[in-house]
Amino acid sequence: MPNAIVAAEQYREIFLNQHPIMDVRAPIEFTRGAFPNSTNLPLMLDSEREKVGTCYKQSGQQAAIALGHSLVNGPIKQQRIEAWASYVKANPNAYLYCFRGGLRSQLSQQWLKEAGVEVPYIQGGYKAMRQYLIGVIEAAPAQQPLLSLSGMTGCGKTDFLLQRKEAVDLEGIANHRGSSFGKNIDPQSTQINFENQLAIALLQHQTSDAACLLLEDESFLIGRSALPQTFYNAMQAANVLVLEESDDARLERLRNEYVHKMYSGFCERLGPEAGFAAFSDYLLQSLVSIRKRLGGKQHQELQDLMQQALDQQINQNDTSLHLVWINLLLHKYYDPMYLYQLENKSERVLFKGSHQAMHEWLDSYQTR
């Protein structure tokens, strides 16, 4: 297999099958954006890449190539080849790429070949694959009907979506639940990685027999992850389904999400004492983030109730007081905001109903 190259026509198959990719770009490039199925095994480290880049600007390509060879030579070169070979041994069907599928890809492939290891490199590299995924996102709204799932905070939209083959879970991809209290313990990925993962999820969805693309009715920003503008515009024009749930069920669901799950997660990560401190800070800082919209008086009332609930939780292992501030937050903040937004899209509402009724409606939509 002399100088095997993976053609651009195979990008779709690579993403759908989560084909293992050896990314030989520098760590700083990988950190800015990468694909979920890739592993960073750089040809050059950040400092080496910077020196070669400076040399290229000052003295041209040949001087830069010569410098690269002098920087990655001897034991350093051998270590990198061994790391690549080890990866290929664990992933025999691996491909490799650099940023553009150019010199770094070709050199890495050549060094591996000299070591007796054959690995194809991907035509166009990361840049071309990234452009392909951007195109997937831009084209997705035209592929099939788009439906937007709306509903009051705590009505269980995410739980519902996870049960439907028509759905793509935007909040799961963003690693954020969308609301002011929506952050998770692990930080969100970069904007580029969010877009890459969204595109791959859309590709996977297109292989199903779903009759529509079902998405949660999101703001432009999900935490700090921004929906691509053309995709967001299509969502804003989509027909709407409204999921309904009782207030009691909403309260219990939010207590479980905001309190029980987050507290358990922080304690598991940090231990009981530091975990409770981090959990308390998560709640209080989430409230601070909407202080201006609440107003000083309302914020203070909620903060006092929240602190009382935290005190009761740590002293009595009782989370019942959390229901008080959550209830107030719903009725004074989230619900009025939701009802205002729903009024602006009332003409696009196709159906309103409970979880069961919504499942039945979508099942019938699937067979139309």
Curated annotation (Swiss-Prot):
Pfam families reported in the protein's UniProt record: Rhodanese
Listed name of the protein: tRNA 2-selenouridine synthase
Keyword Transferase: yes
Active site: C98
EC number: 2.9.1.3
Family: Belongs to the SelU family.
Top-rank lineage group of the source organism: Bacteria
Catalysed conversion reaction: 5-methylaminomethyl-2-thiouridine(34) in tRNA + selenophosphate + (2E)-geranyl diphosphate + H2O + H(+) = 5-methylaminomethyl-2-selenouridine(34) in tRNA + (2E)-thiogeraniol + phosphate + diphosphate; 5-methylaminomethyl-2-thiouridine(34) in tRNA + (2E)-geranyl diphosphate = 5-methylaminomethyl-S-(2E)-geranyl-thiouridine(34) in tRNA + diphosphate; 5-methylaminomethyl-S-(2E)-geranyl-thiouridine(34) in tRNA + selenophosphate + H(+) = 5-methylaminomethyl-2-(Se-phospho)selenouridine(34) in tRNA + (2E)-thiogeraniol; 5-methylaminomethyl-2-(Se-phospho)selenouridine(34) in tRNA + H2O = 5-methylaminomethyl-2-selenouridine(34) in tRNA + phosphate
NCBIfam families assigned to the protein according to its UniProt record, in alphabetical order: PRK11784.1-2, PRK11784.1-3, tRNA_sel_U_synt
GO terms for biological process, alphabetical: tRNA wobble uridine modification
Keywords: Selenium, Transferase
Assembly description: Monomer.
Purpose: Involved in the post-transcriptional modification of the uridine at the wobble position (U34) of tRNA(Lys), tRNA(Glu) and tRNA(Gln). Catalyzes the conversion of 2-thiouridine (S2U-RNA) to 2-selenouridine (Se2U-RNA). Acts in a two-step process involving geranylation of 2-thiouridine (S2U) to S-geranyl-2-thiouridine (geS2U) and subsequent selenation of the latter derivative to 2-selenouridine (Se2U) in the tRNA chain.
PANTHER family xref list: TRNA 2-SELENOURIDINE SYNTHASE (PTHR30401:SF0)
Segments forming domain Rhodanese: 15-138
Signal peptide per UniProt: none
GO molecular function: transferase activity, transferring alkyl or aryl (other than methyl) groups; tRNA 2-selenouridine synthase activity
Broad EC category: transferase
Disulfide bond entries: none
SUPFAM superfamilies the UniProt entry points to: Rhodanese/Cell cycle control phosphatase
